[in-house]
Structure formats: C-alpha cells, structure tokens
Amino acid sequence: MSEIKLIVGLANPGAEYAQTRHNAGAWYVEELARICGVSLVPDSKYFGLTARAVLHGKDVRLLIPTTYMNLSGKAVGALANFFRITPEEILVAHDELDMPPGVAKFKLGGGHGGHNGLKDIIAKLANDKNFYRLRIGIGHPGDKNKVSGYVLGKAPAKEQELINAAVDEAVRSTEVLFKEDMVKAMTRLHSFKAE
C-alpha cells in the first residue's frame, strides 16, 4: 500500500453550510488538524484551506476545498499535481448516505455513488478512481427525491452526536493508519458503531 500523503475533507464553503451533513468530511479534517496542532489556512493556489501536518513522523497535507462541493476536484487536482501525489496516496473523507450515523469506513477505489464531490475528483484525476475514501455515515432520508435537502440540512442532536463519535473514531483510526497500516486501521474503524 502507498503511504497517504494527502487527506481531503469534502464540504461546501460558508457559515450557512458549516453544520450540514454534507460537510462531515471537513469535520474530520478539522479534527485531524486540531490533534496535529496545525491550522488550516486559505491557499488560493489550491482552492482551499490547507495545512502540512506530521502524523507519527510522516508528512501529510490536509485540504478542505473552498469551492462548492461539485467542484472539489479543482482543489484536489491542483494540490496533487503540484506535489506529485498519486491517487493511491490520497484519502478523501466524505458523507455517506448508505451508512447510518455512528459508522465510518475506509475504502479503496469504487465509483462516486452519486456524490458530486467524488464525481468531480474522479474526473480531475483523469478518471482514476483508485484513491482511498473515508465514508462517514449520515443515513438516508428514505426517498431519493429528498436527498438534496437532507444532505444540506443539519442532523438532529442525537444523530449529530453519533456522527461526531464516528468522526472521532476515524481520527483515532487514522493515527493507527500512520503508525501501523491500513489493514489495522480498517480493522479498528470497521468494528466501531456509536450507539
């Protein structure tokens, strides 16, 4: 397995979106930055908030695109190209409708599952889908016509607690990833379910 050199948290920019379900990926990167003791700062060259962190002696770039979600690939492509980071060295954290709140899972490759942020990243990486994902469960509204309003809405307090617990566990599992390997990180994270 390649070492992860770039961790991306997907989000929509602006205060009105900060607490919406669609921004779960950004919550994870913000927490990772906090435990690494680094500040995410705006960088127009990479169309996002970026930081350089060190996790268990390994350098990693953190990125939260500040474009809208459906243009996330612009930021990821710009930073990956500049630092010559390959898709296999990228971990993208995003909200996942097909998993309940309180659960998060790592995954390598796959499609975009209708997620516009992932769709744009795949396009900007020359259709290479072979990057890692951290899927953060937000649950599903039960009707595909309600998805847009659902992801752009705030979770009720109990659901938010579950999502936050999964994000915290994902951060701890990321430390395992950098200290040991992806298999151990997956084993830890995939056995977790906040109640």
Swiss-Prot record:
SUPFAM superfamilies registered for this protein in UniProt: Peptidyl-tRNA hydrolase-like (SSF53178)
Catalytic reactions on record: an N-acyl-L-alpha-aminoacyl-tRNA + H2O = an N-acyl-L-amino acid + a tRNA + H(+)
Source domain of life: Bacteria
Site (described: Stabilizes the basic form of H active site to accept a proton): 95
Cross-referenced InterPro entries: Pept_tRNA_hydro, Pept_tRNA_hydro_CS, Pept_tRNA_hydro_sf
Its biological purpose: Hydrolyzes ribosome-free peptidyl-tRNAs (with 1 or more amino acids incorporated), which drop off the ribosome during protein synthesis, or as a result of ribosome stalling. Catalyzes the release of premature peptidyl moieties from peptidyl-tRNA molecules trapped in stalled 50S ribosomal subunits, and thus maintains levels of free tRNAs and 50S ribosomes.
Similarity remark: Belongs to the PTH family.
Subunit-level organization: Monomer.
Name of the protein described by the UniProt record: Peptidyl-tRNA hydrolase
Gene: pth
